[in-house]
Regions:
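Short linear interaction motifs
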Residues: 24-40, 255-278
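Extended, beta-strand-rich, solvent-exposed assembly scaffolds of outer structural proteins
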Residues: 1, 5-53, 73-150, 172-203, ...
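Beta-strand-rich domains and repeat architectures in extracellular enzymes and scaffolds
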Residues: 1-7, 269-292
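Short active-site loop/helix that positions an aromatic residue
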Residues: 56-58
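Long, low-complexity, polar/charged, intrinsically disordered or flexibly structured peripheral segments
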Residues: 202-265
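Post-signal-peptide, soluble extracytosolic/periplasmic N-terminal scaffold domains
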Residues: 64-65
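Beta-propeller domains
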Residues: 5-25, 246-249, 254-257, 262, ...
Length: 301
């Protein structure tokens, strides 16, 4: 095939002189250049041709990841008889004391007694998780725990924990905690979220991304696609993962990846963001961009 790019237009011809239909659901503005010959580069991989506009500055999408309310989990780690358990929220302390009666120092009973002591706390959502209590609020709050067993029988995790083993064994679906790791640097920090299994009332912590970040590429500024379809026609568009059906055939366009874990320190934006991509290549099953003095390559796929 021969591809001809003009200002705001793209044509595909066969070597026999046949012109093929090119559908353009989006992306033609990417071709709005007065010097197509000096502006565009392309590389073909199987049924896809990636086209770059060397005058286009790449950017991240303005959309941001979801954010969470302020949240914390109090955990009763062990029940000890004749011991006081305390939770202090925004400066007010709520307490319960166990006795020598075994039922009073079961962890679930201690939690129930603390929830009763706290009562209806304005602005808070409070959830009984058995041996744990989940707190959330749209406004920030302070919360600490103490106990009469050297503060070894309870703990509170709010926003951060130093080690993975410090995390509570239960939480509410979607709760995010930062694992701070070594205090001497920020490079080993990572984030985990609670993934709940509703069928077992259990769950697990899974690595995730800090909320509120711009994690996706602005596909309007990234190299675009010319895709050959089974019906002989072509489709020029953004590489945005769009799915569509044509003549009974399902298509899924390639999609540039997103930041799925970490933050802007541990998983920074690629160096080509804010730059103009000057060339594109394919090497050992990896797509590569040249921007400024950097070469950035995809994972092997």
């Amino acid at each position: 095939y021969i591809v001809i790019i003009t200002q705001n237009s793209l044509e595909v011809w066969g070597i026999d002189g046949t012109q093929y239909t090119v559908n353009t659901p989006d992306g033609t503005s990417y071709l709005n250049e007065s010097d197509p010959k000096g502006t565009f580069e392309a590389i073909t991989i199987a049924d896809y041709t990636f086209i770059i506009n060397k005058n286009k500055t790449t950017a991240m999408s303005s959309s941001t990841g979801a954010t969470r309310p302020y949240e914390a989990v109090y955990s009763c780690l062990q029940g000890v008889d004749q011991t006081e358990y305390n939770i202090t929220i925004n400066g007010t302390t709520y307490s319960t004391t166990t006795t020598t009666t075994a039922s009073t120092y079961q962890t679930t009973e201690i939690v129930d007694s603390l929830i009763t002591a706290i009562g209806a706390l304005s602005g808070f959502t409070i959830t009984d998780l058995g041996s744990d209590i989940y707190f959330s609020n749209t406004s920030d709050f302070t919360i600490t725990s103490t106990d009469g067993y050297g503060n070894q029988a309870s703990q509170v995790v709010k926003s951060t924990a130093q080690k993975f083993t410090d995390l509570p064994t239960k939480a509410v679906a979607g709760m995010v905690v930062e694992i701070s790791g070594d205090d001497s640097n920020n490079f080993d920090n990572h984030y985990v979220k609670w993934v709940a299994d509703s069928s077992t009332d259990e769950g697990y912590w899974q690595e995730t991304v800090l909320g509120g970040l711009q994690n996706d590429f602005d596909t309007a500024t990234m190299p675009h696609l010319l895709a050959r379809q089974a019906d002989g026609e072509f489709r020029f568009c953004e590489s945005d993962g769009d799915t569509y059906t044509l003549s009974g055939t399902d298509y899924t366009l390639p999609l540039y990846g997103s930041r799925t874990v970490g933050d802007t320190v541990s998983a920074p934006e690629p160096s080509f963001i804010g730059q103009k991509i000057s060339d594109i290549f394919f090497h050992r099953n990896r797509l590569g961009f040249i921007a400024g003095e950097s070469v950035v390559m995809s994972r092997a796929g």
